[in-house]
């Protein structure tokens, strides 16, 4: 059985590079510093949130360790943005799924606006929930600023088509100014299960591979962890983007157990 993995050297080297990227984002590119004056504040908030998460952590699957940290010191001060890796294949995969379902309205939790959401807005209305602000874009995109771990304004079993792409790995880590705590991940999973209608489709993606917490950037999930999280939903398809950024449709989940940083694409149905 072929396993998709790409070794990137000792973990401490990766950690050091991520810290350099987090502390000195103006090195790549320099213009980041010139337009962002929240540098000292971001450092302080990282350590505040690290201490809060460490004190409140009740999830033994993701122990918090400084050596695995992935400091994201500016994201909380920015509007919903753009990240390159995984996103082209991920957004194409999910938008194709929504298009083929022929729904007239789709709901999304925090996915990339200028990729997946824009694709879907061509052929259906999209209602977007995100904790960060979003300016008006076009008539087919409706935005509600909301915490997806607490969707009190969304009725039970009310959504037939739902997505959240490259979002859940960040929940509870404070990266985007969201509440800090390990319970936020499960809270969001519970909300998805609650609001999804019977027969409803859920398109979901997160980083997959060797499971770890890279505070305060993200989690990387074992595929089995994701399947356990959504045990109340039926898995329709598992596809993945490997460490070399190549897309594999209808992949074998076991081949990604040793991946370093791949992306799992999950199609669930309630």
Map each language-model feature to its residues.
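Short conserved AdoMet
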Residues: 121, 197, 231
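Class I S-adenosyl-L-methionine
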Residues: 223-270
């Amino acid at each position: 059985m072929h396993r998709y993995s790409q070794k990137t050297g000792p973990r401490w080297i990766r950690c050091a590079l991520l810290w350099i990227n987090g502390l000195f984002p103006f090195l790549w590119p320099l213009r980041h510093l010139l337009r962002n004056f929240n540098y000292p504040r971001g450092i302080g908030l990282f350590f505040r949130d690290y201490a809060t998460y460490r004190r409140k952590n009740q999830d033994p699957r993701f122990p918090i360790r400084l050596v695995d940290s992935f400091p994201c010191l500016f994201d909380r001060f920015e509007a919903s943005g753009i990240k390159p890796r995984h996103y082209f294949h991920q957004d194409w995969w999910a938008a194709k799924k929504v298009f083929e379902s022929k729904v007239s309205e789709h709901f999304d939790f925090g996915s990339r606006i200028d990729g997946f959401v824009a694709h879907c807005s061509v052929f259906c209305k999209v209602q977007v929930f995100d904790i960060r602000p979003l300016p008006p874009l076009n008539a087919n995109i409706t935005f509600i600023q909301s915490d997806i771990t607490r969707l009190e304004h969304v009725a039970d079993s009310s959504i037939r088509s739902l997505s959240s792409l490259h979002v859940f790995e960040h929940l509870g880590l404070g990266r985007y100014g969201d509440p800090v705590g390990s319970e936020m991940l499960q809270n969001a999973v519970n909300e998805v299960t609650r609001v999804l209608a019977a027969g409803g489709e859920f398109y979901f993606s997160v980083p997959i591979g060797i499971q770890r917490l890279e505070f305060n950037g993200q989690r990387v999930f074992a595929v089995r962890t994701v399947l356990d999280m959504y045990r109340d939903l039926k898995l329709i398809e598992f596809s993945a983007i490997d460490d070399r950024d190549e897309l594999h449709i209808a992949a074998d989940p076991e081949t990604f157990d040793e991946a370093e940083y791949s992306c799992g694409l999950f199609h669930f149905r309630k």
